[in-house]
């Protein structure tokens, strides 16, 4: 699970995926305010709980979307 305040490579992966899905954010490895807003927007778009926490359901949908945008 990832949430606001987290840092590291997993956050970078999250940010790269969000960016590839069309969200405007910096890939810096810090789960701050902008990343939180992007996650909540992604969750709302995909009918997920809009809690800003990247748990199994949000990760699953992100992986699905990333595969569509960046196949292979």
Write out the residue ranges for each language-model feature.
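Acidic, Ser/Thr/Pro/Gly-enriched interdomain connector segments
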Residues: 1-30, 34, 68-72
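Extracellular LysM carbohydrate-binding repeats and other cell-envelope/extracellular binding modules
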Residues: 35-37, 41-72
